[in-house]
């Protein structure tokens, strides 16, 4: 891939990250807290993958582990936020992972913490990667 293609690919991941964060906030407004928590994870994952592409000049690895992905881009500054969001990829969607019904397990307070964590990660990625 050429540098222009790499930048375009990174921007695609970045734009989708921002879109997922907006979706998360809208889902909070309609009390869909488990969906919002999952979307916060997705926003963070896609932001980190955009940064990975910018830093490594290649496509990101497959996977959903935010901590592992964060380490690959030296995201120690937001490690606590990555730890907050990491479990929501599964527990926000699967009753067997949550040991309950996800749509009944989440509250506004929990999900707002997820949004705060995702915002902090996205702000860090923007600053670190020089993304718009």
Model-derived segments and their meaning:
Residues 1-132:
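Terminal alpha-helical segments
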């Amino acid at each position: 891939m050429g540098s222009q293609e790499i930048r375009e690919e990174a921007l695609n991941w970045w734009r989708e990250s921002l879109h997922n964060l907006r979706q998360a906030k809208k889902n909070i407004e309609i009390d869909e807290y488990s969906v919002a928590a999952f979307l916060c994870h997705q926003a963070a994952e896609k932001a980190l993958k955009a940064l990975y592409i910018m830093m490594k000049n290649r496509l990101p690895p497959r996977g959903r582990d935010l901590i592992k992905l964060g380490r690959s881009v030296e995201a120690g500054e937001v490690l606590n936020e990555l730890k907050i969001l990491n479990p929501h990829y599964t527990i926000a969607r699967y009753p067997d992972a949550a040991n309950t019904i996800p749509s009944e397990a989440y509250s506004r307070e929990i999900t707002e913490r997820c949004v705060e964590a995702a915002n902090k990660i996205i702000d860090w990625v923007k600053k670190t990667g020089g993304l718009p």
